[in-house]
């Protein structure tokens, strides 16, 4: 548990889930509640060259990673900053070996971890359909504030059509988002409460 009222997945749980994943070139992987980015970054720790190829001054992603998190105030925004800092740490060896890719990395870095500030819904305000081959996540599980989220969804026609709004709590909304965001045949590894 963190001072910011957020819960982060223990690293041993992240690693156990990541070890179950089968990766292939061209995959698009997402964590819709990425926090500090561990579900997306842990797979690259031991196999960085499977994810990124360097050709001259070009950094070419072989697998696309996308992490979303929400942030209205400075404390919430720190989480996505930490995800980007983690990415820099995980890729520091590659950058050190290839100093010409720093601008490419800066773009990748900002395209990978995206802060959602436009709505209390965060990622849920992005009605994505059949975009990802793999989703790895530990979405938030809270009941308080869920009615506010459902009210916000009800105000927006596109979101009202996207969500059934019958889900209990924010975790139900995230589960619905995950199912809709997966490509046909895609897989999701989701931490759920007991």
Each language-model region and where it sits:
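Conserved Class I SAM-dependent methyltransferase catalytic core
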Residues: 164-194
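A glycine-rich, aromatic-flanked flexible loop/lid motif
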Residues: 141-152, 178-185
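Conserved S-adenosyl-L-methionine
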Residues: 9-130, 134, 142, 192-194
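Charge-dense, intrinsically disordered terminal/linker segments
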Residues: 125-126, 130-133, 146, 175, ...
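Long recognition/docking surfaces used for binding and targeting
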Residues: 1-2
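A short beta-strand submotif of the Rossmann-like class I SAM-dependent methyltransferase core
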Residues: 137
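A mobile, often basic/glycine-rich helix-loop segment
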Residues: 145-167, 194
């Amino acid at each position: 548990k963190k001072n910011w009222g957020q819960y982060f997945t223990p690293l041993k749980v992240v690693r156990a889930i990541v070890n179950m994943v089968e990766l292939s070139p061209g995959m698009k992987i997402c964590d819709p509640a990425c926090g500090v980015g561990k579900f997306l970054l842990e797979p690259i720790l031991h196999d960085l060259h499977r994810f990124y190829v360097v050709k001259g001054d070009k950094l070419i992603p072989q697998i696309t990673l996308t992490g979303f998190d929400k942030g209205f105030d400075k404390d919430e925004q720190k989480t996505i900053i930490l995800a980007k800092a983690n990415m820099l740490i995980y890729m520091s060896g590659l950058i050190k070996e290839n100093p010409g890719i720093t601008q490419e990395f800066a773009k990748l870095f900002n395209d990978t971890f995206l802060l959602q500030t436009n709505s209390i819904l965060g990622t849920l305000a992005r009605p994505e359909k059949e975009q990802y081959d793999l989703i790895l996540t530990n979405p938030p599980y809270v009941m308080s504030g869920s009615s506010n989220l459902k009210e916000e969804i009800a105000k927006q026609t596109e979101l009202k059509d996207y969500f059934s709004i019958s889900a209990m709590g924010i975790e139900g909304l995230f589960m619905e988002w995950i199912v809709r965001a997966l490509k046909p045949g895609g897989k999701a590894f989701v931490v759920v409460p007991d």
